[in-house]
A protein has these predicted regions:
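Short hydrophobic/aromatic-rich beta-strand motifs
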Residues: 32-44, 335-337
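Short, intrinsically disordered N-terminal pre-domain segments
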Residues: 1-32
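Short aromatic-cysteine micro-motif
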Residues: 120, 124-127, 151-339
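GGW-centered surface loops in extracellular recognition modules
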Residues: 30, 60-132, 138-140, 234
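Acidic glycine-/aspartate-rich tracts in secreted/extracellular proteins
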Residues: 44-47, 136-138, 172-173, 350-351
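C-terminal, surface-exposed recognition/capping segments
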Residues: 239-243, 265-300, 323, 339-352, ...
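Short, surface-exposed terminal/edge motifs of secreted or surface/virion proteins that either
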Residues: 41-59
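Cytochrome P450 core scaffold surrounding the K-helix E-X-X-R motif
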Residues: 142-143, 177-178, 350-361
Length: 455
Protein backbone atom coordinates (compact mmCIF):
# COMPACT_ATOMS: atom_id res chain seq x y z
CA UNK A 1 0.00 0.00 0.00
CA UNK A 2 1.49 3.28 -1.09
CA UNK A 3 1.01 6.71 0.56
CA UNK A 4 0.15 9.79 -1.37
CA UNK A 5 2.48 12.77 -1.33
CA UNK A 6 0.21 14.63 1.13
CA UNK A 7 0.07 11.61 3.42
CA UNK A 8 3.85 11.25 3.33
CA UNK A 9 4.26 14.93 4.26
CA UNK A 10 1.90 14.51 7.23
CA UNK A 11 3.84 11.47 8.45
CA UNK A 12 7.08 13.46 8.19
CA UNK A 13 5.51 16.31 10.22
CA UNK A 14 4.40 13.86 12.91
CA UNK A 15 7.86 12.30 13.11
CA UNK A 16 9.50 15.76 13.21
CA UNK A 17 7.16 16.95 15.97
CA UNK A 18 7.87 13.82 18.01
CA UNK A 19 11.63 14.19 17.47
CA UNK A 20 11.61 17.87 18.49
CA UNK A 21 9.35 17.32 21.48
CA UNK A 22 10.62 18.23 24.96
CA UNK A 23 10.02 16.88 28.39
CA UNK A 24 8.38 19.27 30.85
CA UNK A 25 11.65 19.49 32.76
CA UNK A 26 13.41 20.65 29.57
CA UNK A 27 11.14 23.66 29.01
CA UNK A 28 12.45 27.17 29.88
CA UNK A 29 11.05 29.04 32.87
CA UNK A 30 8.44 31.72 32.27
CA UNK A 31 9.54 35.34 32.36
CA UNK A 32 7.95 37.79 34.79
CA UNK A 33 6.36 37.14 38.16
CA UNK A 34 2.66 37.25 37.27
CA UNK A 35 1.55 33.67 36.51
CA UNK A 36 -2.00 34.80 35.86
CA UNK A 37 -1.09 36.28 32.48
CA UNK A 38 -0.26 32.81 31.19
CA UNK A 39 -2.22 30.43 28.97
CA UNK A 40 -2.67 26.79 29.85
CA UNK A 41 -4.14 23.70 28.21
CA UNK A 42 -7.49 22.44 29.46
CA UNK A 43 -9.67 19.50 28.51
CA UNK A 44 -13.29 20.31 27.72
CA UNK A 45 -15.72 17.64 26.46
CA UNK A 46 -12.77 15.47 25.53
CA UNK A 47 -11.13 18.19 23.44
CA UNK A 48 -7.93 20.07 24.30
CA UNK A 49 -8.40 23.84 24.45
CA UNK A 50 -6.44 26.84 25.67
CA UNK A 51 -7.54 29.03 28.57
CA UNK A 52 -6.16 32.07 30.35
CA UNK A 53 -5.11 31.07 33.83
CA UNK A 54 -6.98 34.10 35.19
CA UNK A 55 -10.32 32.61 34.06
CA UNK A 56 -9.86 29.81 36.58
CA UNK A 57 -8.89 32.05 39.50
CA UNK A 58 -12.29 32.05 41.24
CA UNK A 59 -11.59 28.40 41.96
CA UNK A 60 -8.10 29.22 43.18
CA UNK A 61 -8.87 32.26 45.35
CA UNK A 62 -9.27 30.21 48.51
CA UNK A 63 -5.71 28.96 48.05
CA UNK A 64 -4.16 32.35 47.24
CA UNK A 65 -5.99 34.59 49.71
CA UNK A 66 -6.35 35.16 53.44
CA UNK A 67 -8.50 37.69 55.24
CA UNK A 68 -11.45 38.22 57.57
CA UNK A 69 -15.20 38.67 57.47
CA UNK A 70 -17.67 40.13 59.93
CA UNK A 71 -21.42 40.40 60.22
CA UNK A 72 -22.04 44.07 60.92
CA UNK A 73 -25.26 43.22 62.77
CA UNK A 74 -23.29 41.21 65.36
CA UNK A 75 -21.77 43.17 68.25
CA UNK A 76 -18.72 40.96 68.78
CA UNK A 77 -15.37 42.67 68.28
CA UNK A 78 -13.95 39.36 67.05
CA UNK A 79 -13.98 38.59 63.33
CA UNK A 80 -13.78 35.33 61.38
CA UNK A 81 -10.68 34.29 59.47
CA UNK A 82 -11.32 33.26 55.87
CA UNK A 83 -9.25 31.93 53.00
CA UNK A 84 -6.19 29.70 53.19
CA UNK A 85 -5.61 28.86 56.85
CA UNK A 86 -1.93 28.21 56.19
CA UNK A 87 -1.54 31.84 55.09
CA UNK A 88 -3.01 33.02 58.40
CA UNK A 89 -0.05 31.28 60.01
CA UNK A 90 2.67 32.37 57.60
CA UNK A 91 1.24 35.91 57.03
CA UNK A 92 3.08 36.53 53.73
CA UNK A 93 1.60 40.00 53.17
CA UNK A 94 2.36 41.11 56.72
CA UNK A 95 5.89 39.76 56.67
CA UNK A 96 6.75 42.21 53.90
CA UNK A 97 6.76 44.94 56.55
CA UNK A 98 10.35 45.78 57.51
CA UNK A 99 12.31 48.66 58.92
CA UNK A 100 14.71 50.62 56.75
CA UNK A 101 16.58 53.88 56.30
CA UNK A 102 15.24 55.97 53.42
CA UNK A 103 17.13 58.82 51.76
CA UNK A 104 15.44 62.04 50.64
CA UNK A 105 15.04 60.69 47.10
CA UNK A 106 13.01 57.77 48.43
CA UNK A 107 15.75 55.16 48.02
CA UNK A 108 16.40 52.49 50.64
CA UNK A 109 19.85 53.03 52.15
CA UNK A 110 19.72 49.86 54.22
CA UNK A 111 17.26 47.47 55.83
CA UNK A 112 17.41 47.28 59.61
CA UNK A 113 18.11 44.21 61.71
CA UNK A 114 14.67 42.57 61.99
CA UNK A 115 15.33 41.55 65.60
CA UNK A 116 16.79 44.80 67.01
CA UNK A 117 17.27 48.21 65.41
CA UNK A 118 19.39 49.74 68.16
CA UNK A 119 22.68 48.85 66.47
CA UNK A 120 21.90 51.09 63.49
CA UNK A 121 22.51 54.81 63.06
CA UNK A 122 19.04 56.33 63.36
CA UNK A 123 19.88 60.00 63.98
CA UNK A 124 18.95 61.18 60.47
CA UNK A 125 22.49 61.37 59.11
CA UNK A 126 21.97 58.25 56.99
CA UNK A 127 18.27 58.64 56.23
CA UNK A 128 14.81 58.58 57.78
CA UNK A 129 13.75 55.58 59.86
CA UNK A 130 10.78 54.09 58.03
CA UNK A 131 8.76 50.89 57.74
CA UNK A 132 8.34 49.47 54.25
CA UNK A 133 5.11 47.68 53.36
CA UNK A 134 2.82 47.04 50.41
CA UNK A 135 3.39 45.36 47.03
CA UNK A 136 0.37 43.08 47.43
CA UNK A 137 -3.29 42.93 46.42
CA UNK A 138 -6.44 43.48 48.45
CA UNK A 139 -10.18 43.37 48.05
CA UNK A 140 -13.02 44.79 50.14
CA UNK A 141 -16.44 43.33 49.47
CA UNK A 142 -19.91 43.39 50.99
CA UNK A 143 -22.60 40.73 50.69
CA UNK A 144 -25.79 41.68 52.55
CA UNK A 145 -24.60 42.22 56.15
CA UNK A 146 -21.23 40.54 55.64
CA UNK A 147 -18.12 42.67 55.12
CA UNK A 148 -14.92 40.98 53.94
CA UNK A 149 -11.28 42.03 53.74
CA UNK A 150 -8.99 39.89 51.58
CA UNK A 151 -5.22 39.98 51.02
CA UNK A 152 -3.15 38.15 48.41
CA UNK A 153 0.29 38.26 46.86
CA UNK A 154 -1.32 37.61 43.48
CA UNK A 155 -3.50 39.79 41.19
CA UNK A 156 -6.74 37.90 41.65
CA UNK A 157 -9.80 39.19 39.74
CA UNK A 158 -11.41 42.14 41.53
CA UNK A 159 -8.37 42.80 43.71
CA UNK A 160 -6.59 46.15 43.83
CA UNK A 161 -2.84 46.59 43.89
CA UNK A 162 -1.36 48.13 47.03
CA UNK A 163 1.92 49.74 45.94
CA UNK A 164 5.11 49.69 47.96
CA UNK A 165 4.85 52.41 50.63
CA UNK A 166 6.89 53.75 53.52
CA UNK A 167 5.54 54.97 56.83
CA UNK A 168 7.40 56.72 59.62
CA UNK A 169 8.52 54.26 62.29
CA UNK A 170 8.00 56.97 64.92
CA UNK A 171 5.68 59.85 65.64
CA UNK A 172 7.34 62.59 63.61
CA UNK A 173 9.52 65.36 64.95
CA UNK A 174 10.86 68.41 63.09
CA UNK A 175 14.45 69.29 62.24
CA UNK A 176 14.30 72.87 63.49
CA UNK A 177 17.15 74.22 61.33
CA UNK A 178 15.46 73.14 58.09
CA UNK A 179 11.78 72.75 59.05
CA UNK A 180 11.83 69.19 57.73
CA UNK A 181 9.47 66.58 59.15
CA UNK A 182 11.68 63.78 60.46
CA UNK A 183 11.51 60.19 61.67
CA UNK A 184 14.70 59.85 63.70
CA UNK A 185 16.18 58.99 67.08
CA UNK A 186 18.02 62.21 67.91
CA UNK A 187 18.08 64.13 71.19
CA UNK A 188 19.97 67.21 69.97
CA UNK A 189 18.40 70.67 70.02
CA UNK A 190 17.96 70.52 66.25
CA UNK A 191 15.35 67.79 66.74
CA UNK A 192 13.58 69.29 69.74
CA UNK A 193 9.97 68.11 69.69
CA UNK A 194 6.86 69.44 71.38
CA UNK A 195 6.50 73.16 70.67
CA UNK A 196 10.31 73.62 70.66
CA UNK A 197 10.54 74.55 74.37
CA UNK A 198 14.30 75.14 74.80
CA UNK A 199 13.93 76.04 78.49
CA UNK A 200 12.78 72.46 79.19
CA UNK A 201 15.96 70.82 77.85
CA UNK A 202 17.43 70.02 81.28
CA UNK A 203 14.13 69.13 82.94
CA UNK A 204 12.33 65.80 83.24
CA UNK A 205 9.69 67.14 80.86
CA UNK A 206 12.27 67.72 78.13
CA UNK A 207 11.01 67.42 74.57
CA UNK A 208 14.44 66.64 73.11
CA UNK A 209 14.02 63.57 70.93
CA UNK A 210 10.23 63.62 71.34
CA UNK A 211 7.58 64.07 68.62
CA UNK A 212 6.66 67.58 67.50
CA UNK A 213 3.18 68.94 68.27
CA UNK A 214 1.06 72.08 68.05
CA UNK A 215 1.51 72.17 64.27
CA UNK A 216 -1.32 72.57 61.78
CA UNK A 217 -1.97 69.96 59.12
CA UNK A 218 -0.99 72.56 56.53
CA UNK A 219 2.41 73.02 58.15
CA UNK A 220 2.90 69.29 58.71
CA UNK A 221 2.38 68.85 54.96
CA UNK A 222 4.81 71.67 54.17
CA UNK A 223 7.47 70.34 56.55
CA UNK A 224 7.19 66.87 55.00
CA UNK A 225 7.53 68.29 51.46
CA UNK A 226 10.59 70.29 52.55
CA UNK A 227 12.51 67.02 52.55
CA UNK A 228 12.52 67.04 48.72
CA UNK A 229 11.84 70.40 47.09
CA UNK A 230 9.35 70.40 44.24
CA UNK A 231 8.12 66.90 45.03
CA UNK A 232 5.03 65.43 46.71
CA UNK A 233 6.86 62.20 47.52
CA UNK A 234 7.14 63.03 51.23
CA UNK A 235 3.96 63.57 53.25
CA UNK A 236 2.69 63.51 56.79
CA UNK A 237 0.54 60.49 57.69
CA UNK A 238 -1.96 59.83 54.89
CA UNK A 239 -5.41 58.32 55.11
CA UNK A 240 -4.52 55.54 52.65
CA UNK A 241 -1.63 54.43 54.87
CA UNK A 242 -3.68 54.76 58.07
CA UNK A 243 -6.46 52.68 56.55
CA UNK A 244 -4.23 49.90 55.26
CA UNK A 245 -2.33 49.58 58.54
CA UNK A 246 -5.64 49.22 60.36
CA UNK A 247 -6.79 46.35 58.15
CA UNK A 248 -3.39 44.66 58.34
CA UNK A 249 -3.78 44.57 62.11
CA UNK A 250 -7.38 43.32 61.96
CA UNK A 251 -6.54 40.49 59.56
CA UNK A 252 -3.51 39.44 61.62
CA UNK A 253 -5.21 39.42 65.03
CA UNK A 254 -8.83 38.79 63.98
CA UNK A 255 -10.18 41.49 66.27
CA UNK A 256 -11.50 45.02 65.75
CA UNK A 257 -10.12 46.04 69.15
CA UNK A 258 -6.45 46.99 68.84
CA UNK A 259 -6.31 47.47 72.63
CA UNK A 260 -6.87 43.82 73.45
CA UNK A 261 -4.22 42.66 75.93
CA UNK A 262 -0.91 41.87 74.23
CA UNK A 263 -0.34 38.10 74.02
CA UNK A 264 2.86 36.48 72.76
CA UNK A 265 1.26 33.04 72.56
CA UNK A 266 -0.33 31.70 69.39
CA UNK A 267 -3.72 30.02 69.37
CA UNK A 268 -3.95 26.23 69.17
CA UNK A 269 -4.30 26.64 65.39
CA UNK A 270 -1.12 28.73 65.19
CA UNK A 271 -2.76 32.15 64.75
CA UNK A 272 -2.00 35.50 66.40
CA UNK A 273 -4.31 36.46 69.25
CA UNK A 274 -4.88 39.42 71.56
CA UNK A 275 -3.94 42.93 70.48
CA UNK A 276 -1.42 45.69 71.16
CA UNK A 277 -2.41 46.38 74.76
CA UNK A 278 -3.55 49.69 76.26
CA UNK A 279 -0.65 51.62 74.77
CA UNK A 280 0.21 55.04 76.16
CA UNK A 281 -3.39 55.91 77.07
CA UNK A 282 -3.65 55.47 80.85
CA UNK A 283 -2.39 58.78 82.25
CA UNK A 284 -4.51 61.03 84.43
CA UNK A 285 -5.54 64.07 82.39
CA UNK A 286 -5.03 66.56 85.22
CA UNK A 287 -1.62 65.19 86.20
CA UNK A 288 -0.42 65.17 82.59
CA UNK A 289 -1.54 68.77 82.18
CA UNK A 290 0.25 69.81 85.36
CA UNK A 291 3.40 67.90 84.39
CA UNK A 292 3.94 69.31 80.89
CA UNK A 293 0.70 70.76 79.52
CA UNK A 294 -0.25 67.70 77.42
CA UNK A 295 3.00 67.66 75.46
CA UNK A 296 4.66 64.39 74.35
CA UNK A 297 7.00 62.57 76.72
CA UNK A 298 7.85 59.19 75.09
CA UNK A 299 11.24 59.38 73.28
CA UNK A 300 11.18 58.43 69.60
CA UNK A 301 12.65 54.97 69.14
CA UNK A 302 11.97 53.87 72.71
CA UNK A 303 10.86 50.39 71.54
CA UNK A 304 13.51 49.91 68.84
CA UNK A 305 14.97 46.87 70.59
CA UNK A 306 11.86 45.04 69.29
CA UNK A 307 13.03 45.51 65.68
CA UNK A 308 10.40 44.61 63.08
CA UNK A 309 8.39 42.90 65.77
CA UNK A 310 5.18 43.63 67.64
CA UNK A 311 5.14 44.12 71.40
CA UNK A 312 5.16 46.59 74.25
CA UNK A 313 7.79 48.10 76.55
CA UNK A 314 7.23 49.64 79.95
CA UNK A 315 8.01 53.33 80.47
CA UNK A 316 8.17 54.93 83.92
CA UNK A 317 6.84 58.46 84.19
CA UNK A 318 9.03 61.04 85.97
CA UNK A 319 8.24 61.71 89.61
CA UNK A 320 7.23 65.24 88.60
CA UNK A 321 4.18 63.62 87.00
CA UNK A 322 3.37 61.38 89.94
CA UNK A 323 5.42 60.44 92.99
CA UNK A 324 4.17 56.86 92.66
CA UNK A 325 6.26 56.34 89.49
CA UNK A 326 3.33 55.72 87.17
CA UNK A 327 4.09 53.22 84.41
CA UNK A 328 2.69 53.03 80.88
CA UNK A 329 3.20 50.48 78.11
CA UNK A 330 4.57 51.79 74.81
CA UNK A 331 3.20 49.57 72.04
CA UNK A 332 4.71 48.70 68.69
CA UNK A 333 3.16 47.09 65.62
CA UNK A 334 5.62 45.50 63.19
CA UNK A 335 8.17 48.27 63.68
CA UNK A 336 5.68 51.15 63.99
CA UNK A 337 5.87 52.81 67.41
CA UNK A 338 2.74 54.18 69.10
CA UNK A 339 0.26 53.41 66.30
CA UNK A 340 -2.32 54.89 68.69
CA UNK A 341 -2.26 56.78 71.98
CA UNK A 342 0.34 59.21 73.37
CA UNK A 343 -0.61 62.13 71.09
CA UNK A 344 -3.17 62.77 68.35
CA UNK A 345 -2.04 62.40 64.74
CA UNK A 346 -3.06 64.53 61.77
CA UNK A 347 -4.03 62.60 58.62
CA UNK A 348 -3.80 63.98 55.09
CA UNK A 349 -5.73 62.95 51.98
CA UNK A 350 -9.13 63.19 53.67
CA UNK A 351 -11.44 66.21 54.01
CA UNK A 352 -14.91 66.22 55.54
CA UNK A 353 -17.60 68.72 54.56
CA UNK A 354 -19.80 69.12 57.63
CA UNK A 355 -23.12 70.80 57.02
CA UNK A 356 -25.11 72.50 59.80
CA UNK A 357 -28.55 71.54 61.04
CA UNK A 358 -30.12 68.35 62.28
CA UNK A 359 -30.81 67.14 58.75
CA UNK A 360 -27.39 68.00 57.34
CA UNK A 361 -24.70 65.58 56.19
CA UNK A 362 -21.04 65.15 57.08
CA UNK A 363 -19.63 64.17 53.70
CA UNK A 364 -16.31 62.32 53.59
CA UNK A 365 -13.97 63.02 50.65
CA UNK A 366 -10.70 61.14 50.13
CA UNK A 367 -7.78 61.51 47.75
CA UNK A 368 -4.84 59.25 46.87
CA UNK A 369 -2.96 61.86 44.81
CA UNK A 370 -0.68 63.88 47.13
CA UNK A 371 -0.43 66.69 44.58
CA UNK A 372 -4.11 67.42 45.26
CA UNK A 373 -3.92 67.37 49.08
CA UNK A 374 -5.25 70.66 50.47
CA UNK A 375 -7.13 72.22 53.37
CA UNK A 376 -9.57 74.42 51.47
CA UNK A 377 -11.59 72.37 48.96
CA UNK A 378 -12.47 68.94 47.59
CA UNK A 379 -10.98 69.21 44.10
CA UNK A 380 -9.55 65.87 43.05
CA UNK A 381 -11.20 64.13 46.00
CA UNK A 382 -13.89 61.42 45.83
CA UNK A 383 -16.97 61.26 48.02
CA UNK A 384 -16.95 57.83 49.70
CA UNK A 385 -19.77 58.16 52.21
CA UNK A 386 -21.02 60.13 55.17
CA UNK A 387 -19.57 60.40 58.65
CA UNK A 388 -21.68 59.80 61.76
CA UNK A 389 -23.23 63.01 63.06
CA UNK A 390 -23.07 62.09 66.74
CA UNK A 391 -20.29 61.29 69.19
CA UNK A 392 -20.00 57.82 70.64
CA UNK A 393 -18.44 54.41 70.28
CA UNK A 394 -18.26 53.27 66.67
CA UNK A 395 -20.85 50.71 65.56
CA UNK A 396 -20.51 50.87 61.78
CA UNK A 397 -17.95 52.27 59.36
CA UNK A 398 -18.41 53.44 55.77
CA UNK A 399 -16.39 50.45 54.45
CA UNK A 400 -17.56 50.35 50.79
CA UNK A 401 -15.33 49.10 47.98
CA UNK A 402 -12.13 50.53 49.47
CA UNK A 403 -12.46 49.57 53.13
CA UNK A 404 -13.13 53.08 54.45
CA UNK A 405 -12.61 53.22 58.23
CA UNK A 406 -14.51 56.44 58.97
CA UNK A 407 -17.41 55.96 61.43
CA UNK A 408 -20.83 55.91 59.79
CA UNK A 409 -22.88 55.07 62.88
CA UNK A 410 -22.26 55.19 66.63
CA UNK A 411 -23.90 53.02 69.26
CA UNK A 412 -21.17 50.50 70.02
CA UNK A 413 -19.15 50.14 73.21
CA UNK A 414 -15.61 49.86 74.55
CA UNK A 415 -15.74 46.06 74.12
CA UNK A 416 -18.28 45.71 71.30
CA UNK A 417 -18.25 46.40 67.57
CA UNK A 418 -15.18 48.56 66.76
CA UNK A 419 -14.39 49.43 70.40
CA UNK A 420 -13.13 52.93 69.47
CA UNK A 421 -14.65 56.36 70.01
CA UNK A 422 -15.78 58.98 67.52
CA UNK A 423 -15.62 62.69 68.30
CA UNK A 424 -17.31 65.36 66.19
CA UNK A 425 -19.36 68.54 66.49
CA UNK A 426 -21.78 70.21 64.12
CA UNK A 427 -20.83 73.78 63.12
CA UNK A 428 -23.20 76.71 62.67
CA UNK A 429 -22.20 76.98 59.00
CA UNK A 430 -20.67 74.65 56.42
CA UNK A 431 -17.10 73.74 57.42
CA UNK A 432 -14.22 71.73 55.97
CA UNK A 433 -12.73 69.54 58.68
CA UNK A 434 -9.61 67.40 58.82
CA UNK A 435 -9.28 64.12 60.71
CA UNK A 436 -7.14 63.24 63.73
CA UNK A 437 -6.48 59.58 64.57
CA UNK A 438 -5.13 57.71 67.56
CA UNK A 439 -6.04 59.64 70.70
CA UNK A 440 -3.97 61.02 73.57
CA UNK A 441 -2.21 59.62 76.61
CA UNK A 442 -5.27 59.90 78.87
CA UNK A 443 -8.02 58.57 76.57
CA UNK A 444 -7.80 55.00 77.92
CA UNK A 445 -10.26 52.51 76.43
CA UNK A 446 -11.71 55.04 73.98
CA UNK A 447 -8.38 55.02 72.13
CA UNK A 448 -7.31 52.60 69.43
CA UNK A 449 -6.40 52.35 65.77
CA UNK A 450 -9.89 53.55 64.77
CA UNK A 451 -10.18 56.37 67.39
CA UNK A 452 -10.73 59.60 65.49
CA UNK A 453 -11.77 63.22 65.83
CA UNK A 454 -12.87 65.66 63.14
CA UNK A 455 -11.35 69.09 63.65
Amino acid sequence: MALSTDEENKVREIIEAFTNGKRLSDLPNVSGNNPFNLLCEVLEDGESKKAALATMLPYMEEQCMYGIERDKTVSSRLVTRIGNTALHKSLPVHNRMRGCLLDDDGNVVEYLNPRDWTGHVRDGSRGQVMVEFGDFYCRFETSANIERVKFSLFPLPGYRYVPLMYVSAYEATVQRSTNKLSSVVNTTADYRGGANQADWDTLSKTVLGRPATQISRTNFRTYARNRKAGSTKWNCMTYDVQKMLYWLFVVEYATLNSQEAFNTQLTAEGYRQGGLGDGVTTLDSGKWNTFNGYYPFIPCGYTDELGNGTGEKEYTMPTEYDASSKKVKVCRYRGIENPFGHIWQWTDGINVRINPGSNGLSEVFVCSDPSKFNDSNYNGYSHVGNEARAEGYVKEIIFGESGEIIPALVGGGSTTYFCDYHYTNIPASVALRGVLFGGGAYNRCVCGSRFCEFD
